[in-house]
Amino acid sequence: METGRQYSMPSNLNNPILTEQSVLLLEDGFCFCSPEEKAFYPFSDFGVTPEDGIAEFLHQKSIVDDCQLVLFNSPSILIPSLNYDAKLVSNYWEPYASLAPTSELKSSNSTNGLVRFIYPQTKAISQKLPWINKIPAYALLYDRIIEYSQQDFNKQIYVHLFAGFFDLFITQGTRIIMANRFPHLNEEDFMYYLFYAAEQLQLSENSVKIYFLGEFDSFASYYEGVKNFQNDLHFMETSVSHLPISQDPVPFWNA
């Protein structure tokens, strides 16, 4: 078995996850990503609603097209396309989380057509940003993870760490066994949820590879914590961020 730090090298090594300039909608602000810049803007800087703040920013940048809004402020649920029924969208979502009165459920298809993503979107986004292409973050994460996962038919764990949360995908080939988001304040929180999920799925830490989406200074203690229990760590390399998490809350995401 391979041990120690490993770097995965599929065909898209170091390709950014974003293929066009994008606004990443977070809970407390947004990141603007383009090939030339990446910056975080707290909503408190605008003094208006999140949707108005984004609209104002894009107007100041004179961006009227060629931009996408990546919905990061909520995870998605994944439904196999063969089982998907558009009339049951609310039923799919109800056991997962409550839906705010200001939001509505949307769905979209994965690039490979295997799953449907169901996710909430505020009605104000549809009203105030009707022209911008909107996509759930899970759709882009899924595409990147499946590109790696389909090369190995053993079970694998993929971890996407960002400010305050981490997304956990457990896969086997092109099959998604689990996709969920968990909160974290420190490495202890992270370790608890990570190994709790692995235990629930009866995954032995020494029989499954763990992939981190990128390797970043802000999460160095998290990697070290996992290494105490699991040596077979892999990092999906992208542009490295050495900024504190307060300045780059989603370090894996670059254009």
Annotate each predicted stretch with a short phrase:
Residues M1-A255:
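Hydrophobic/aromatic-enriched cytosolic interaction surfaces used to assemble or bind macromolecules
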